[in-house]
């Protein structure tokens, strides 16, 4: 997606890191919880170590799905993720394990910084991105700035 003279990528966990740097992506936001240990797609503790030498900035703002966050917890964490999306150098890639939580974070960015109504941002994230989790859809629809 492009907007505000920036390019954004919303995706599942990258399987290789050199293509990210080679594509000119400047920043990566991971919204995975470092405690995710489920194989074959566990949290990659080497991600920052692989991206930084490629001159790609990296940060992690977890949106955990187990245990489920309260609406207030979601609002705070999604807001923090949206701040990163809004302020870090583009092009920016945001990811989680499957793209679902990354899509929720991007929807909150659209609400918070692009002026989208909650329902429109949630619909975009469901139809154009990978938002599918019913709880995250509800939390995007009910999002308010913390």
Labelled PLM ranges:
Residues 1-93, 104-146:
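Cys-dependent protein tyrosine phosphatase-like superfamily
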Residues 96:
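Short cysteine clusters
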Residues 99:
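Substrate/cofactor-recognition hotspot
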